[in-house]
């Protein structure tokens, strides 16, 4: 029997969740369809964690009052701030998007990531 209050995040070959389209008002390029598996969500939605994936695409990304921890399971991303500065990450790397970020997320290839998103108000 598994330990109480312990929930594994299973990285299966194919996420068994429906495609979620990226809203047209933030989509920059690509089709923007994503899949997400959320095994944990706080009752007040202040913390969410799981697995997210997409094909190559780019979108506007804004984190005014939340942080996101990301660990790339597969793929390459480029994240650019509003001033045009950017950081690139590849499979096996982790990073944090801090509160106040405003810029562009680009999945340069197929991307799959573990993530934790937390409100910071």
Question: Where is each model-derived feature located?
Answer:
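A short, N-terminal "cap"/entry segment at the start of jelly-roll beta-barrel domains
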Residues: 1-46
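Conserved short histidine dyad/triad with adjacent acidic residue
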Residues: 46-64, 98-99
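Residue-level recognition of conserved beta-strand positions in structured domain cores
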Residues: 51, 64, 81, 107, ...
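Well-ordered beta-strand positions in beta-sheet-rich domains
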Residues: 51, 86-88, 102-104
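Short, conserved beta-strand element in jelly-roll/cupin
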Residues: 64-79
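Short acidic-glycine-tyrosine-enriched beta hairpin
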Residues: 83-99
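Ligand-binding loop in jelly-roll beta-barrel domains
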Residues: 99-121
């Amino acid at each position: 029997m598994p330990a109480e209050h312990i929930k594994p995040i299973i990285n299966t070959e194919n996420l068994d969740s429906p495609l979620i389209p990226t809203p047209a008002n933030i989509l920059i390029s690509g089709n923007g369809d994503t899949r997400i598996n959320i095994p944990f969500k706080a009752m007040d939605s202040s913390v969410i964690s799981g697995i997210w994936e997409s094909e190559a695409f780019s979108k506007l990304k804004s984190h005014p009052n939340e942080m996101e921890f990301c660990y790339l399971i597969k793929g390459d991303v480029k994240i650019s701030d509003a001033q045009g500065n950017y950081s690139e990450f590849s499979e096996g790397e982790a990073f944090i998007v801090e509160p106040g970020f405003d810029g562009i997320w680009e999945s340069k290839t197929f991307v799959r990531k573990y993530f934790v998103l937390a409100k910071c108000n």
